[in-house]
Amino acid sequence: MLSGMRPTGSLHLGNYYGALKNWTELQYQYDCYFFVADYHALTTGYEDVSHIEDHTHQMVIDWLAAGLNPAVATLFVQSRVPEHAELHLLLSMITPLGWLERVPSYKDQQEQLKEKDLATYGFLGYPLLQSADILLYRPMGVPVGEDQVAHVEITREIARRFNFVFGREPDFEAKAERAIKNLGSKNAAIYRGLRRSYQEQGDAAALTRAHALLDGNSRLTLADHERLLGYLEGTGRTILPEPDALLTATPKVTGLDGRKMSKSYGNTIGLREDPDEVAKKLRTMQTDPARVRRTDPGDPEKCPVWDLHKLYSAPDVQAWAANGCRTAGIGCLECKKPLIDRVVEEITGMRQRAQEYEDNPEQVRGIIAEGCEKARGVASETLDDVKQAMGLTYR
């Protein structure tokens, strides 16, 4: 299992409930590798690198304070495992440009970050670097939310293409071409067109149609049927296994202004923020606009505070808050009181655990060094297999 985060600043409750909390559970179920994606931080923040070292160090402290256990999970820094960059380079030789341009987040981030110069190869190629990050450890799965499934899918396509190009049996292509002729001239032409659409454009509908074409053809032997499926999908000897996207429940973490909690919106509560500041932020957090006066009833579903109640409050407290809101039986500040207590309690625990590591920076560096060494051991084995398949081993 593998996942990572970009070190772009202090972590907040959105990061914790969106990923970290899930990681703390997964580490006891799988062999997990969690990395600080400092190369990825450069794709949108290369103009100022003055804080990247400190952000990386502080991110690892946040992880440890949140409950990641270096005794069971491997924590490391991406740039300290050079195999990431080398596999990225090698995979770039076989990745069609169009595959990178059609990743949904490519255009989305260009729109969202118009003030930044994103006309760089690094930004265009970050999904490929992400694929290299994943494939290097040959994980069975990658924990993601719904919005990240496309990133895992392009990783699967790249692995499939690599296995197709470099993992085929001797004379695989010649045997596949002979099998295509056995389809008959009309079906052979259709198959070639569908194969081209899928491999060059990632057309999933073409893949489905090609499967149906092969399944419905009685001229093929079983061996040729399987061979043409491999020729179509780009499979062969599996050097880089295709990882699954493991959809994980990621609860909505609402920011102080009612939007998704995000550093870019300036609406966050930091994992190690001062408790008094946290309480102040929550007391002034937006509520249901219908509650102008204390006696005005409201609707919890229209109140950003309610989303946090669902994360933090026990069922009886949620029922009290919802009923009090709808009937105007309680005011907004009264509603926030038990929530503030719970959030401050959690933040205080994070701060205390983090302080132990702040006071022992050498311990943190040791955890990182040990994790990097272990990660390199696994990564180098994969890279050796990749280079051997590509003919890049020399005496």
Task: Place the predicted regions along the sequence by residue.
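N-terminal Rossmann-like or analogous alpha/beta NTP/dinucleotide-binding catalytic cores
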Residues: 2, 7-132, 153, 157-159, ...
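Conserved nucleotide- and phosphate/pyrophosphate-binding catalytic cores
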Residues: 13, 150, 156-395
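Flexible, glycine/proline-enriched loop segments at strand-loop-helix junctions
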Residues: 109-116, 138-149, 267-269
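Membrane-embedded alpha-helical core segments of multi-pass
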Residues: 129-130, 136-137, 163
